[in-house]
């Protein structure tokens, strides 16, 4: 594996003239400290990073282009809202860098990366990825078994990307810092001016947290699952991202 090198943080000025710093992922494999940021920060940081999956057909590398943050016990959209600790959510209470995989609608798996430290149940849902090479795309097609002419259909949604990468409940609980089957590496962060924020998808039960701008994606990337016409640039939304209700 590639040794990680800390790249520090990028200084950005928002629309009000306020300066903020976005931590950047390392060169090489993610470290424990990288995963231990809060979910909102990690969700932003993960954009442009490389998700690596070892499959029976070989290694597949993909670029993360869309994420959602789930911010723990106070977040009514989070599985661990109000400290809910069940057999299903137990993985969220593990250390940052643990894979949290769950099954929805009786047919799809979703891959999340646990954020923060042990017993601070936050996570980042990976909503969309893009294959890095033609070989990566070919392996994804093998597992998705689709003939769509639109390459983005392979992995422009959380269920689709799990099928394309052969991710299921057996991956739940994997420590992505040490695993040889599933891990993340720092890629090329797109920059604050290319990232937009929007409300998370399909969480009507989250009440006032439904409108939180905790979905992040690379603007105009063809692999993004849903482009929101009301999306707000990261540089305009930064101060609101961390406001408590």
What are these model-derived regions, one by one?
Residues 2-245:
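Conserved, well-structured core segments that form or line functional sites
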């Amino acid at each position: 594996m590639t040794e990680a090198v800390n790249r520090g943080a990028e200084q950005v000025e928002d629309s009000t003239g306020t300066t903020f710093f976005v931590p950047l992922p390392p060169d090489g494999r993610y470290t424990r400290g990288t995963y231990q940021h809060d979910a909102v920060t990690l969700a932003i940081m993960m954009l442009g990073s490389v998700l690596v999956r070892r499959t029976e057909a070989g290694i597949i590398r993909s670029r993360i282009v869309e994420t959602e943050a789930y911010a723990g016990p106070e977040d009514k959209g989070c599985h661990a809202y109000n400290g809910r600790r069940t057999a299903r959510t137990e993985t969220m209470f593990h250390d940052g860098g643990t894979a949290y995989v769950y099954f929805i609608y009786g047919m799809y798996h979703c891959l999340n990366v646990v954020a923060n430290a042990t017993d601070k149940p936050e996570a980042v849902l990976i909503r969309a990825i893009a294959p890095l090479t033609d070989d990566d795309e070919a392996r994804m097609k093998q597992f998705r078994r689709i003939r769509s002419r639109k390459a983005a259909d392979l992995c422009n949604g959380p269920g689709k990307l799990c099928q394309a990468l052969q991710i299921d409940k057996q991956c739940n609980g994997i420590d992505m810092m040490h695993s040889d089957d599933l891990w993340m590496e720092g890629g090329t962060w797109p920059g604050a001016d290319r990232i937009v924020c929007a409300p998370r998808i399909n969480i009507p039960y989250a009440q006032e947290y439904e409108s939180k701008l905790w979905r992040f994606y690379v603007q105009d990337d063809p692999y993004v699952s849903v482009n929101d016409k009301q999306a707000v640039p990261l540089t305009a939304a930064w101060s609101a991202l961390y406001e408590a209700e």
